[in-house]
Structure formats: structure tokens, C-alpha cells
Amino acid sequence: MNLLRLTLAGTPVEMGRQHGRQIKPLRPHLLAVIEQRIAELRQLGADNPAVVQSCLDFMAEADRPLLAYLAGLSEALTIEPRRLQLYTLSSYLRDLWRAQQTIPSASPPFVQEGCTVWAASGPATADGRPLLVKNRDYHADHLPLQILAHVAPADGYRYLSIGSAGSPEVFSSGINERGLAVADTHVLSRDIGPGLPRFSLMRELLTHHDSVASALDYLRSVPHMGAGTLMLADAGGTLALCESGHRRCGYVISHGETALVNTNHFETPALAGQWIEDEPPALRGNSLGRRRHVLTALQQGWGTVDLPWAQRLMAAHGSPQEALCR
């Protein structure tokens, strides 16, 4: 699939305007997606104005680059700023609503995003160089919106990112000019609250950090919104997984002695009990199954892992419980 390529440079508001101008052909589809998400929130009663405002108040203090970017984007697309903000927060608002349901089976199940991410380096790979790999399994209506952005911030490292038209610039994954790479997955979690969303954390990592060690120092110093994971790899081969929660986070670090794999549940003691599995019966267990599938493949392919190997693995279909490409 050919991704629409964006070129963004300057301040956050300037890059937001550039983003909006460069995706004008996608505007009708984007508007339809925005209206659908907002309608879903309204139907659930998940669009509580006080909750939305608490997030925006936090961002006004701690994440001004995000609000500036969205302001430029809404201006270029002539979308009412509040609607774009609500759309940007829609995943968090839906998760918060879901986490507050007392009886899991009393609420309708949602097909959760099925992204799979892994990283390997050193003795695991054919040439010793690090690999960070992701299958992006997101909303089907985002397929036409997928973008590859070349980003040159006014202050910071240049980077490439994969994301969605109409969303913040690092909405899925990226790598900067110093070789720091990051990719996220979503986890439906009870441990969520006002904080920095994953796309803002990834933006800051790519803009200002050049190693996993530096990235982890940053992640430990700021409040997280939660509800997901971040996989990190740097040019030196250090790997790390951050399981992101609002009240606590879990971390796993590897210097190449082990590969790291994450899907859509938590594994660390800090957060394992916060995961909510809420999928239709046919897909129950698929996050655990996908992780197990990749771990087994990496063990069997140890020392031979390279880009073609990774592409073959991530194209694997199979049963609903272990298919990596869905």
C-alpha cells in the first residue's frame, strides 16, 4: 500500500497547518471518520464535557505542542477546533468509559486494535544490527488515512513517522536521525487518567532523545495517560519496553540478550492486573496468542533474523488467536 507522504517543518502550529494543507484530498473521508467517532462517544455517553476539559487543562500546562499542532491542523482543514480535540481524545474517552463499567459482560464488546510489535538486536539478528518491527492493525476506516511524515522540528532531531491524516504527527511509530526508534500498541486498561498520550510521548522521544537510556529517563519523569505500550530501540542495540499506565508504569530492558515482544496486554507485575480483555469470543486470547507466536518464531530463528525474515513473519495469517496480519 502506498502511503501519502507529508513534509513537515517548523513550529508545532506551522507543522499542523502544513499537515492540513497536504491532506486536503482526504478531507471528506476524514470528516466522516471524525463524525463517526464523535457519534460513538455520544451514544455511549463517553463525551462528558468535564472529562474532556480536564484533559485539555492538563495539556494546556504539560503538552502545549500538541494543542498548537491541532490548532494549525484545524485551521488548515477548517474544522472546529473543539471537534478535532474531541476526535483526538476519542480512544482515551472510550477506554475511560469502558474501564468504569462495573460488570465487563454488561457492556458491548469492542474489537480492540491488534497491533503487534517486537524488537531484536545483537545475537538475535543476522548482522547484529537492531530491528524494531510493527504490524499496524487499526480501525479499517484509517487505511486510506495512513501517512508517512518527514518531520523537521524547529527545535530537535529530524525524524520519520507513520501515522494517520488528521491525527498528531507520531500516531503509530517513528525513527529519528540519531537512530532512536519507537512504536506503540494499545491496551485497554483500568489505569488511565489525564496525562501525556502515547503520541505525545513518542513525539518528545523522537524530537529530543538519541538513546534508549535517555528515553527511559524522560518516560520516568512525566505523567502518562496510560492505556498502551511503547517499544524502543536505539542504534547501539539497546531495547526497552515501557508498559504505560497513569499511576504506574512497567519497564523491561534488553541489551540484545533477549528479544522483546508486546501486543495488546500487559505482562509486567506493575500493570498485568490492570488489563481488561474485552473482545468478542472468537478473538478472546488473541493478544496472548500473537505474543506467543512471535516469541516462538524468534527463538527458532535466533541469529538469522533480518528484514525479509521479519516481513514473512508479520504477513502470517492463521487462526484468530494467533494471526499477526488480520
Language-model segments: residues:
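Surface-exposed flexible segments
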Residues: L143-A149, C242-C249
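C-terminus-biased signal that marks the final domain/tail of proteins
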Residues: M1-G114, L206-R247, E257-R326
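Internal mixed beta-strand/loop scaffold within catalytic domains of large alpha/beta enzymes
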Residues: S91-L201
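Short acidic-glycine loop/turn motifs at beta-strand connectors
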Residues: S121-D127, N176-R178, A233-G237, S244-H246, ...
